[in-house]
Each structure stands twice: as C-alpha cells, then as structure tokens.
A protein has these predicted regions:
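Extracellular beta-strand-rich solenoid/capping regions of secreted or surface-exposed proteins
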Residues: 59-65, 76-92, 99-118, 123-142, ...
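Extracellular calcium-associated, cysteine-rich motifs in secreted modular proteins
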Residues: 463-552
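Acidic Gly/Asp/Thr-rich repetitive segments characteristic of extracellular carbohydrate-active
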Residues: 24-69, 504, 572-579
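Right-handed parallel beta-helix
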Residues: 88-93, 112-123, 140-153, 165-184, ...
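C-terminal tail/sorting-segment detector
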Residues: 586-605
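Extracellular beta-rich repeat passengers
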Residues: 215-220, 229, 241-462
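Residue-level detector of functionally pivotal "anchor" positions at catalytic/ligand-binding pockets or at interdomain
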Residues: 549-575
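Extracellular beta-strand/beta-solenoid scaffold signature
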Residues: 103-107, 128-138, 153-161, 182-196, ...
C-alpha cells in the first residue's frame, strides 16, 4: 500500500471515529437513547432457524456481543426459558422476511448498549406462569433503544423499564396484559412501570390494560447507577432524585382503565401532547362474583376517563424501605398539550393540569400543590417554601425536564401517526392491526373470559392468539446473500458493493458522512419510508440524516408503498379454500392495505 492510500485510510478511520461519537443509533432514533451504538462494527450473525437454542438460533445469536443480528427466517420463536440479550448487540428485526419475528412464551431482557428494532414479544401464559412474568423488562442498565417493537400478553407487566440510563422506547405497542392468568395477587392486567435517568417514551400505543398504563416509577428505589450515565458530566446530579428525568410524549392511551400515575420518591416528568382515549371497559363497574372480580355494564362513564395523571406520594408501602429519605415526596411535572376523549365522544384539548389528581400527603399554598422535600434532595436550584413547618417544592414545573433530540406532534396528529406506524409495522401482524382499528373506532373485539370486560383479556385464548403452529413462516431463497454479510446480493450490486466480499458490509463506503456501515445503510433503507412517514407533519421536527442508496428491482416483499398500511393477511389453498393458517406446501396469500389495495401472491411454508 502506498503512502497516499495509507493517508486516505487513516483519514477515513478518523472521520468515522469522530462521527460515531454523536451518531444516532439509526436515522429516526430519538430521545435519550438516540446515541446508543449497539453492535456497530461487530460480528454479523444470522438467525437461520426458529429453534429455541442451538446453532442458528436467536438465543445463540444474542448470547454475547459485539454483534449485529440479521434474520434469514421469519415466524414465531417458541422460547423454552427466559432470554437475556448480551451487551453491545444490535437486533435488526426488519431484515427478516415476511411475516417478521415474534418471540413467545417467556420473558425477554435487554442488556447494556442494545439497539432492538421491529421485533414482536408476545409472551402468554401457556407455557409458564410466575408473578414476575413481564413480556419484557429491565433496570440498572445503560443505553437501550427499542424502536417499532410490539409487546403483549404478560402475567405481570407488559413492558417495564425504570432505573436505566439513556433509554428510549419509541413507536412501540404495549397492550393486552393478561388480567387473570394465574398471578398470585389475582387480577393484574398491568401495562408497565416507566422511569429512568434520562428516559424517553414517545409515540407509543398503550392499550387494553386494567392498570399501570403507565405507572411512573420515580426515584423511590434510590438507585445510584446514574453516575454511569453518558450525560452525567453535563448534569452533575447530586442524587437520584435530580437524576430521575423522564420524557413522556406523543403516546396514545386507549381503553386503559388506570392511565398514567405514580412518580413517588421524586424526579422530573414531562407529559406532553399525548392522546387519552377511553374505551368500552370504561363504561363498566367492577363487582365480585363467586370470589372473582368482574366488570358489569352500567351505561355510565367511569370518572377517570379524563385523567392525565395521578401524582403519587412516596410511602413505606410503595417505596424502598431502606430509603425513608424519599418518603412523602412526589415527582415534579411539566404537563402540556394533552387531549382526552371520553366514551361519549367528548374531546378536550389541553386538558393538562385540569386532569391531574393527587394522593393524600401533598401540601397547598396559594392554590398551588406542593411536595415535601425535607432533605433538600431537589437542590438549591429549585425554590423551596416552608408549609406547615415542612420544606416543600412546587409540583408544577414551568420548564420541561431534558427531552433529548425529539420530534413532537400535536396530540391529534400523534393519534393518527401512532395508529398508522407503531409496533413492528414493516409486517404488521393481525394483533397490532386489530389494536389500531379498535382504537380508531372506539371498540373492543374481544372480552376477558373471566372478567367479562371488553378489551381487558384474561388469557391468550380470549383473543385467539397465534402460536408457532398457527402463524406463518418465511425464509430467504438460496443465493439471496452469497457472501453472508447480511446484505442481499441484488442490493450490493445496485449500490456498488461486492456480493462475494463479506468485508464490505462493515465499511463506510456508502455513507458520505461516515455515520453508518454499509450493512446499517441497507437495514435502515428497509424502513426509511416508515421512519419518514412517522416523523412528518411535526410541530417540532428533527432534521434527520439519511444516507443515499439505490433500490434494486424486485427486492421488496411488497410494492413500494408504506408496509405499515397492511391491515389484513389471509391464506388460501390452491383450490381457493380459506385457511385458518397457512398449510405445509404452497399457499395463496391475500394482503389488504388500508388504502383498499389488495395484493395476492404465492408463499411456501
């Protein structure tokens, strides 16, 4: 190699290193997990089968990092035990063929520095029941971003993430917790506990829950891991209360009986431009029949249909008993731009502080509500006032907590955007499609077999939930990726790469800014339309950078339309008989899109 080439290579390496310092996880990654690096530059690992474990399995692929996970197959992976994802992993669910990847039966836990995209985790009670059985959860980690994932069917909470650093959950669906699947405490049906030390929850769909939709965690557990936060040097928090900063915006809550509440122990929470829509379970009241809590129709609206949040005071019963210094404290809130809609169609924009209620234990001064702060944990930068001999801080914040880089829509626009794009929407399954139609029409197709409450289900069978035996599968044809670098041959050829040289996947030749490897450019291209469509029409937009690429003919599973518009897929035998699920051999697949377009093709199972 001559000196000129050496200097050119060194310059390229330096440019990439500088770019990586502030490179988004992918174009459209936003919030406090925006700059997670995952497995970038790591080993490319293919998932080649739907087995629970062993060579080619998803479990084997994620057991250690630094790795980038791509998929040669699609369908349901029937887990046989809880799955823990190693540190420094990127999971590119969008690289799977139709119908995408669903994980079932056990809990999935991410690790430090994880990027997880376009994946479905639908746990269920069929194989395992325990009181901690979330579909997914994690705490005490640094650097996690979930993008366009679908979570459902949990025994405890659907998706709980708190006491993590630099976290984002964006464009996900969190719905249909199981109310009476066998939890020792009886009826559960919870959405999630959300919090963190710079944590973002934006553009998510939260639906069909009995409670915790979501519950804000606050600083009640006294976690001190905030010193590992990537932004600690910027903020220099003195304690966990100051470090607890949560941004909750542009989410849609539908038929969630216990909407937002919590925040005990202190912290800062933004609740901005969310849409709260009551559902059919809000027209019921609870009663007990044969020792089981059930819902019965009353024809009256429940009183909490327009609640924005309930501010919770920390006590010995809801907080860590080893941290009494947080007792009597609440979080502080910035609340703006939120819309409510009742079951009778009454819409109230900017409900905001008129929709806030409070636990007992707060203080009032000049018609303002205050939280106790006896130990001055909020710090001298926050004005304190002595009320009844107790040092207190105002609960209402005039300035929002840190938001990170974030796109913001109005609440009305967020409602439309979330319904069109949230969840694993590249190949939206019938479950997410149903959620969105129910939210749009104010209905619930199913009810709990025990509770009898519309939308508030008890078991997976209540909604005829799919399994590995009833859900379609898919695989890549031979010759799709000759060099096994994660990029299809046709795409490599169209973009000037070598389909016989695996090393070019992890170089930066396609991205003129040096942000993304060629493999990342390919993977991001698969969902670029979805990301751009979701972020369009914003009141506050992020100027996202998308590297240029060329689309080869015939590589898309669908024609060039937004795959998130897919609303229904049905299968037929070759003689035209409607099938409940694809059969072994050749099937005719019929795809119906929201714009009325119908496409058919043949698929092999």
């Amino acid at each position: 190699m001559n000196n000129k080439k050496i200097l050119t290579s060194m310059a390229a390496a330096l440019m990439s290193a500088a770019a990586l310092a502030q490179t988004p996880a992918f174009p459209g990654a936003e919030g406090h997990g925006r700059y997670v690096t995952g497995g970038r530059d790591g080993k490319v690992v293919h998932v080649t089968n739907l087995n629970d474990s062993g060579t080619g399995s998803f479990r084997e692929a994620v057991k250690s990092g630094k790795r980038i996970i791509v998929f040669d197959v699609a369908g349901v992976i029937a887990l046989k035990s809880d799955l823990k994802i190693a540190d420094n992993i990127t999971i590119l669910g969008q690289t799977a063929p139709l119908p995408g990847i669903t994980l079932r039966y056990f809990t999935v836990q991410p690790g430090n520095n994880n990027i997880i995209r376009f994946l479905r985790i639908r746990r269920g009670e069929e194989k395992n029941i325990n009181d901690g059985a979330d579909a997914t959860w994690q705490r005490n980690k640094t650097g996690i971003i979930f993008d366009h994932c679908s979570f459902s069917w949990s025994i405890d909470e659907v998706a709980s993430f708190y006491d993590n650093n630099n976290f984002t959950m964006q464009w996900c669906t969190v719905a249909e917790s199981l109310t009476n699947p066998g939890h020792s405490k009886g009826a559960h049906g919870y959405g999630g506990i959300w919090g963190g030390k710079l944590a973002s929850f934006h553009h998510n769909f939260i639906g069909h829950l009995m409670n915790r939709g979501p519950r804000f965690n606050g600083a009640r557990y006294g976690w001190t891991g905030y010193t590992s936060n990537k932004n600690y040097s910027t903020y220099q928090w003195k304690n966990t209360v100051q470090a607890e900063n949560v941004d909750f915006r542009n989410c849609v809550m539908y038929n969630a009986q216990g909407t937002c509440y919590g925040g005990p122990g202190g912290g800062q929470i933004n609740i901005v431009n969310n849409y709260y829509k009551a559902g059919p379970s809000h027209s019921l009241k609870s009663t007990t029949q044969n020792g089981i809590k059930v819902d019965v129709s009353t024809g009256k609206e429940r009183g909490n249909q327009e609640r924005i949040t309930l501010v919770t005071v920390s006590t010995s019963s809801n907080s860590d008993k080893n941290h009494p210094e947080f007792y009597e404290m609440t979080s502080r809130y910035f609340i703006n731009g939120n819309t409510t809609e009742t079951t009778k169609g009454s819409v109230t924009k900017n409900k905001d502080w008129k929709g806030v209620s409070y636990d007992k234990g707060t203080y009032t001064y000049n018609n303002e509500i205050y939280s106790a702060d006896k130990k001055n944990l909020y710090g001298d930068a926050v004005e304190h006032k002595t009320i009844n001999g107790v040092s207190c801080v105002k609960i209402k914040m005039d300035v929002p907590a840190p938001t990170g880089v974030i796109t913001t829509h109005t609440a009305d626009e967020a409602f439309s955007k979330v319904l069109a794009n949230a969840g694993a929407s590249l190949f939206r399954d019938e479950i997410d499609a149903r959620y969105m139609e129910e939210a749009k029409t104010g209905t619930a197709q199913y009810k709990g077999s025990i509770t009898q409450s519309p939308g508030i289900i008890d078991k997976v069978s209540d909604v005829n939930g799919y399994t590995e035996k009833t859900f379609a599968t898919g695989s890549r044809p031979k010759g799709f990726d000759t060099d096994n670098d994660g990029i299809p041959d046709d795409w490599e050829t169209a973009n000037g790469l070598n389909p016989n040289d695996a090393s070019d996947a992890l170089t930066y030749s396609l991205d003129e800014k040096g942000y993304y490897t060629n493999l990342e450019v390919y993977a991001n291209s698969l969902v670029e339309d979805i990301m751009k469509t979701g972020n369009a029409d914003a009141t506050k937009a992020v100027d996202e950078y998308y590297p240029a690429w060329k689309n080869p003919t015939g590589i898309s599973d669908y024609p060039v339309i937004n795959p998130g518009e897919l609303v229904k897929v049905t299968y037929y035998s070759l003689d035209g008989t409607l099938l409940s699920a694809p059969q072994t051999g050749i099937n005719i697949r019929k795809m119906v899109f929201r714009n009325g377009k119908v496409l058919t093709d043949k698929v092999i199972k």
